[in-house]
UniProtKB/Swiss-Prot annotation:
S-S bridge residues: C46-C140, C78-C99, C217-C282, C239-C300
Regions of this protein lying in the Extracellular compartment: 23-387
GO cellular component: collagen-containing extracellular matrix; egg coat; extracellular matrix; extracellular region; extracellular space; plasma membrane
GO molecular function: acrosin binding; carbohydrate binding; extracellular matrix structural constituent; identical protein binding; receptor ligand activity; structural constituent of egg coat
PTM summary: Proteolytically cleaved before the transmembrane segment to yield the secreted ectodomain incorporated in the zona pellucida.
Protein name, per record: Zona pellucida sperm-binding protein 3
Compartmental location: Cell membrane
InterPro entries: ZP-C, ZP-C_dom, ZP-N, ZP_chr, ZP_dom, ZP_dom_CS
Domain notes: The ZP domain is involved in the polymerization of the ZP proteins to form the zona pellucida.
PROSITE patterns listed in its UniProt record: ZP_1, ZP_2
Glycosylation sites: N125, N147, T156, T162, T163, N272
Region of interest (Disordered), ranges: 330-356
């Protein structure tokens, strides 16, 4: 049981931690050469604008070959390239922005994330499968100081007002951070009882100051924010409703800066869902930093000691609507996909009401057993009391057995020493 559990975690974390191997298996830098194909079951080549994935049909190393039809890439389930059944490798070749791949910006890199899914289905009229379902995260990292394009970057000295008229898009990011908030979390694994530290950011370059808000967040077992089951973390234009329950989830006060917003979420997993992983999708938006927070643009947490809501900044009145669950008319439904809007020409004439929005996903967050939960250990290794009781029970059984044997032998001896005469 322990071996299969470790194999499951290895398949999920291959290339992300040192649980299975000291070096990542398929996390390659842009332009890096890939290792020998005979060593690894999955190889990834991050090219200038495309992603190439090569999967060995002996994916699990058991000799049981998988079928190419059972493999897909990304949330949009892109199919592999057509290949001969006799080939030992299944190949994918897609654009970096295809198949639903997500892009995040860190301090030093552009990160494109996706996953390889092996979902075996019964063949013909059979109702069984002989291989396991596996979801393998894949990342391509490109240094921000470099240029992934073959065309040179030309400097521009356009002021912000001109950039607004050019309808420039801003860059949003959502990252998992270490507990001290000083660095990005290296491993996506958590124990129940931990808190996930999330940091939302807006990258604006040298433009005028902007203030970032988390409008709403939802957790799902897949990268699709419309999947079921789901759990709402932030709602009603900035109310961190996850803190209403038995969780201590809250926004961090004060925020590091107007362009950054940090918050913690007590980790969880969906009941009756064997995947033990979640993805968190947040709808981020910005306003001008000089604009005061209001009911539509706020960051509010719930305080259990005072049984009230409080904001990261601004008047406490802007959080009162969190109690009613009605904080104004939403720009779009929380559960509907949203495409990043652009700065409009008409809105730029009145910049006080201009906002920019985007949906950003982070994950998977993978959950192990509870901290301090020794049920598995108790199941595997009996406690001292159990050992004593087991020993006493065995001693009683042995004693009763010996007593029965002695009684039988004694009766036979008595019968042999007093034979019954036929004449009598």
């Amino acid at each position: 049981m322990e071996l299969s559990y470790r194999l499951f975690i290895c398949l999920l974390l291959w290339g992300s931690t040192e649980l299975c191997y000291p070096q990542p298996l398929w996390l390659l830098q842009g332009g890096a050469s890939h290792p020998e194909t005979s060593v690894q079951p999955v190889l990834v080549e991050c090219q200038e604008a495309t992603l190439m994935v090569m999967v060995s049909k002996d994916l699990f190393g058991t000799g049981k070959l998988i079928r190419a039809a059972d493999l897909t890439l990304g949330p949009e389930a892109c199919e592999p390239l057509v290949s001969m059944d006799t080939e030992d490798v299944v190949r994918f070749e897609v654009g970096l922005h295809e198949c639903g791949n997500s892009m995040q910006v860190t301090d030093d890199a552009l990160v494109y994330s996706t996953f390889l899914l092996h979902d075996p289905r019964p063949v013909g009229n059979l109702s069984i499968v002989r291989t396991n379902r596996a979801e393998i995260p894949i990342e391509c990292r490109y240094p921000r100081q470099g240029n992934v394009s073959s065309q040179a970057i030309l400097p521009t000295w356009l002021p912000f007002r001109t950039t607004v008229f050019s309808e420039e898009k801003l860059t949003f990011s959502l990252r998992l951070m270490e507990e001290n908030w000083n660095a990005e979390k290296r491993s996506p694994t958590f124990h129940l009882g931990d808190a996930a530290h999330l940091q939302a950011e807006i990258h604006t370059g040298s433009h005028v100051p902007l203030r970032l808000f988390v409008d709403h967040c939802v957790a799902t077992p897949t990268p699709d924010q419309n999947a079921s089951p789901y759990h709402t973390i932030v709602d009603f234009h900035g109310c961190l409703v996850d803190g209403l329950t038995d969780a201590s989830s809250a926004f961090k006060v004060p925020r590091p800066g107007p362009d950054t917003l940090q918050f913690t979420v007590d980790v969880f997993h969906f009941a009756n869902d064997s995947r033990n992983m979640i993805y968190i999708t947040c709808h981020l938006k910005v306003t001008l930093a000089e604009q005061d927070p209001d009911e539509l643009n706020k960051a509010c947490s719930f305080s259990k000691p005072s049984n009230s809501w409080f904001p990261v900044e601004g008047s406490a009145d802007i959080c009162q609507c969190c109690n009613k669950g009605d904080c104004g008319t939403p720009s779009h439904s929380r559960r509907q996909p949203h495409v990043m809007s652009q700065w409009s020409r008409s809105a730029s004439r009145n910049r006080r009401h201009v906002t920019e929005e985007a949906d950003v996903t982070v994950g998977p967050l993978i959950f192990l057993d509870r901290r301090g939960d020794h049920e598995v250990e108790q199941w595997a290794l009996p406690s001292d009391t159990s050992v004593v009781l087991l020993g006493v029970g065995l001693a009683v059984v042995v004693s009763l057995t010996l007593t029965a044997v002695i009684l039988v032998l004694t009766r036979r001896c008595r019968t042999a020493s007093h034979p019954v005469s036929a004449s009598e």
